[in-house]
Every structure is written in C-alpha cells, then in structure tokens.
Amino acid sequence: MQVNPSEISELIKRRIENFDAAAEARNEGTVVSVGDGICRIHGLADVMFGEMLEFPDDTFGMALNLERDSVGAVLLGDYQHIKEGATVKCTGRILEVPVGDAMLGRVVDALGRPTDGKGPIKTEGSEPIEKVAPGVITREGVDQPVQTGLKAIDSMVPIGRGQRELIIGDRQTGKTAVAVDAIINQKDSGIKCIYVAVGQKNSTVANVVRKLEEHGAMDNTIVVNAGASESAAMQYIAPYAGCAMGEYFRDRGQDALIIYDDLTKQAWAYRQVSLLLRRPPGREAYPGDVFYLHSRLLERASRINAEEVERRTNGEVKGQTGSLTALPIIETQAGDVSAFVPTNVISITDGQIYLETDLFNSGVRPAVNAGLSVSRVGGSAQTKIIKKLGGGVRLALAQYRELAAFSQFASDLDETTRQQLERGKRTMELMKQGQYEPQSVGEMAFVLFAANEGYVDDVENDQVVRFEKALLDYLRAEHAELLQRITETGDYNDEIHAEMQKAMDAFKKNRTW
C-alpha cells in the first residue's frame, strides 16, 4: 500500500482547521468531609446561597453555609458513594422541580421524581422551588369560597380562595382527615390539589392515596411525599417543591389548594440540618430564621389579579384571577398552642381550625373547637346562605358552652336556659360528620336551617344523627331540584326560605327517622 505524503498533509491541515480550542471555565471544589447528609467542600469560591451543586454519580446537593474557607451543603438523596476528595461542581442554577398538568394523579418525591411506579412524567417545564411571594399590588381580595364539605368548618370557620388557614391540634385529633375531606370535596369544583406529606410513614401516605383514588379525587391531585425514611434535607424542601407545583396553576388563572402535612416535622428537619451545619441554636434549639422558614412559604399562597395572570402567561390568559389556598397543619404537644412553632404559624396564617382531643374522644368529629377556631378573611368569601344560617349555629354553640359550664353548679334552671342547653346539645350532634362524607352547599344549608328554626328541638338527642341522615335522603329523593339550585346560586331570600320551610314541614310530618 502506497502512502501519499500530500494526502497526509491535507488530512492534518483539515483536522487543525476543525479543532475547537475554546477553554471552558468551571467552578469546582473538593469534598473535605461527608456524613449525616451534610458535606463540607473546599473551593467553590463563586458559589451562591441555595445553589444546586453536582456531586459524582448524578447526586445533587444545595449550598446552605458560605464560610470563609469552606462551603456547607446538604445532600439530596443517597450519598454513600461520595468520598473525601471527590469533585463537586457548581451548576449556576437553584433547585427546580417539574411542574404542569402531567403531574396530576401522580405521587412524587421532593424533587418531583415519580415514586408510584407509573413511569416517567412528561412535563412542560420546571420551576425553582424558592420564589418571591406576589406583592401587595398584584393581589386580589379573598371573596370566593373553598368548600370543604364539612359543616363545622364551612359554617363557622369558612375558607376563601387564596387564604392560609391553619389546622392545629394534638396527634390523633383528625387533622389529616379534615385535609383529605377538603381534597375529596374538590373533585368537581375545578380546584387542583397538592398534598405534601412531610415525615409521614409511607403506609399512612399510601392509605391517603388509596382513599383519594376510591373517591375519584386523585385525578386532580398531586401527592408530594418526603417520608420519615427520607433525609432531613428532603423533608425540609418538600413544602417548597409542592408550593412551586401549586403556583404553576395559580399563575395560569386557575385555583389550587395545597395541604402541608405537617409543618412541625419540616421545622424539626430544618432544625436538624441547621445544627449539623453548626449554626447557632436559639429557642427550643431552633435556628434564628425558623419564622422566615414558614413565612416565606405561606406568603406564596395568595390570590393574584387578572392583570398579573395576563402578565405571567404573556397574554395567553385574560380576565381570570388565579389563587393558591394553603392549609398548613401543625401538631401541638398536650394542647400547647403557645409553643414556638405553633405561635409562629398562627401569626402568619389568616386564622386557625383548632381540633381538640377531648371533643374527639367524646365522639364529636370533626373535633372543631368553635371558640378557639377563627377565620380572619373567610367571612367575605362565604356563600350567602351558609353565612346567614351559620351565624345562628355559632351563637347557639357559644351559649351552650357557657351554659353547660354554669349548669354544673346550678341545680334549678329556668325554662329559657334549659331550652338553650337542649338546642345547643342538638346543634353539637348536628355538627358531627363522618369521614369521607362531604356535603354540598344545599345539604349543609338544610341541616343548618333545621338547627336554626328549631326543627330538631323535639328530636331525642341520640336520634339527631339518624334524623339528619333521613332528612338528607328525603331531600335527595323529593327536592333534588331545590338542593341543586341552592348549591349553584348560594342565594338566600324569602322565596327560598319559604320553600325550605315547606320541605322541612313535609319531612317532619312523615317522621321517618
């Protein structure tokens, strides 16, 4: 074989011309120590706070401590393979999670990776988990209701779209049950739901998912699970990841509801991370910025006006407001709402639903304490008919609590006091509601109407629950059109009052309970 020198020189010339000698500047560092989900890195001079870091074998971390000669980072996911001396690279990005309609109906981890075995999720894009909350000018007032389907809440502590309403109580008082019922009631309302489970047992989360599937609510719900077996860093970022997924819907002129179950465990996870990073501890060993941890999260729940939606969608959506409603859950110890984290979150939110152990154990479920529960902005969002009828119920319960305490000491009570006590007892019974049994506005209105107008005064106390069930069965069979009309319009006037009275009189005449 003959080699032609001119061909070789031509080939070398072509190679030299095509050679790209551009230098690439990269910010790299070296692992100094690793353990307990925390990594200390030497180098990374230009790293930013909260920046995503790339470790070997597709492992990521987040820079949280920027010190003079090292960087403290939390590791997200498995870190057993990371050794001292390993190379760490800056990414120039902050942590992002996938968002979009494709996420609905799926169970994902804190980084948006599917964990339900249903294959990969094809989303339109991703959003950073940390965002600045909407400003005052871009917000709209809270004047549309979020119906939970629970009489005790919708009548006494109403929730509006864009509100933050805290659910607070000891362990085993039905906090998650209230939140799950609220999600189930949204299946036909068009409100998208996000359930963020922080530090829960995987079996508990699986049970919630199964219940949502059984009641047809999983199709418009995203479940973000950072279980008890996950690292503290994953539990810390999970609520922010869920919030970013909810903001996607809000910014497109839709309504979303997000449940954080629960923020106590997120605060514990953040405390653990902070102590491992050797940050100075404060009250109850929490770091100094634990208030900011929750305030920057909950301030992102809001209702934004139509101009802001139009700006965020580049003119695609016009004339529609968007909202993200938050129901954070806080677990108290022995009913102590004056502890550090509970007081922080109470001061951030627009009201709280206080669930009491004594009420729960005595069979009042949902165990809402009407005296300590309050909704600071929900009143203007409440449905007209429920607002009108619910006021009497709240008053009856308040008087009952006062008189019940007084009647323990007084032996002879006058007739008016006795009547108030009896009506209060029956109203308490009417406020009871089974789990996974949300009621429509029409059904709720009739139950409140029965309590207000004295239709249950002559019903035995132990028959009240049966009376309510029989009443609702009768109304669904005989007055379905009226129920539908009340649910759709929410109006309350003399005509509707007369129709409701007529239906109640006919039911009472039959005595079918």
UniProtKB/Swiss-Prot annotation:
It is a peripheral membrane protein. It comes from the Bacteria. Keywords: ATP synthesis, ATP-binding, Cell inner membrane, Cell membrane, CF(1), Hydrogen ion transport, Ion transport, Membrane, Nucleotide-binding, Translocase, Transport. GO terms for cellular component: plasma membrane; proton-transporting ATP synthase complex. Its main location: membrane. InterPro entries: ATP_synth_asu-like_sf (IPR023366), ATP_synth_asu_C (IPR000793), ATP_synth_asu_C_sf (IPR038376), ATP_synth_F1_a_nt-bd_dom (IPR033732), ATP_synth_F1_asu (IPR005294), ATPase_a/bsu_AS (IPR020003), ATPase_F1/V1/A1_a/bsu_N (IPR004100), ATPase_F1/V1/A1_a/bsu_N_sf (IPR036121). Pfam families: ATP-synt_ab (PF00006), ATP-synt_ab_C (PF00306), ATP-synt_ab_N (PF02874). It is an enzyme of class 7 (translocase). Its EC number is 7.1.2.2. ATP binds at G169, D170, R171, Q172, T173, G174, K175, T176. Belongs to the ATPase alpha/beta chains family. NCBIfam families: atpA, PRK13343.1. This is ATP synthase subunit alpha. The gene is atpA.
